[in-house]
């Protein structure tokens, strides 16, 4: 197996419907600017409440193959 390096970033996704949809929103958005996503790990969940409206929020660590540069 070849050696490889992965970078991990933190993202927060939000949804008025569920934590699952919040996580999916973050991952979907990440696919627009990142390549070769590998693993998403939920590190925190909370619910933001404003004027009686709930927003489910998920903090994720997402890893992707590092190709250098920054």
Regions inferred by a protein language model and the residue ranges of each:
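N-terminal, polar/charged subdomain of small-to-medium soluble alpha/beta proteins
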Residues: 1-70
